[in-house]
Amino acid sequence: DFRPRPNGIAILPDGGWLLTHLGDTEGGVFRLTPDGELTPFLTRVDGLDMPPTNYVHVDGQGRIWVTVSTRLQPRDLGYRSRCSDGFIVLVDDAGARIVADGLGYTNECLVHPETGQLYVNETFARRLTRFDVTVDGDLVRKTIITEFGEGEYPDGLTFDSEHGVWITSIVSNRVIRVARDGSREIIVEDSDPDHIAWTEAAYLADQLGRQHLDKAAGKKLKNISSL
């Protein structure tokens, strides 16, 4: 029997959940009902079988946003600063389609509940990016809000009441608040300087792999990946 490897989970307004399948070679989004029934929700888009799929978000209008980090397999080939084959899928009343492509390891994305803009972390491009969303759901006016530095690999995100964006950074085990003007403040940190240095050297040499992510741990916290 097929069992998804859920990486992202979203609650549906009418009950149930959407799960992203982050398989070794396959992806997609699956719907899980409260009684335990699992059915495919999205397995192909624009003629493409969904690669291993990272994240799913249901916005305030009921639109569904899905991220794929990389088309490369194995996925750790995408752990490169120059890799830009990640994309974002929108599922709405018009169907499913890719609305942004060429992203640097697309991770969590959220639509801001007040501004209606979409924010997305590009983990191995090490930046937080924002798009305006048109009435038809197209993503336009791509803006880099901030770029991250040594040991910082943005993964999860959420918003606060002052239009700040809270970001989790794997490897450095940080929670970083990014203000509206792009300034940054470290809120939480539990990191190992030796591990950061080892990982940074591999990243700069295009040799970053799973071992650099899986071994990361602070004194009290393991990898902080989501909020």
Question: Which sequence ranges carry the predicted segments?
Answer:
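Short loop/turn segments immediately following the C-termini of beta-strands
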Residues: L22-D24, S69-R71, T123, V133, ...
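Beta-propeller blade signature
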Residues: R31-G36, S81-A94
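Structural recognition of the beta-propeller blade-terminating site
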Residues: T33-P34, L77, D92, D132, ...
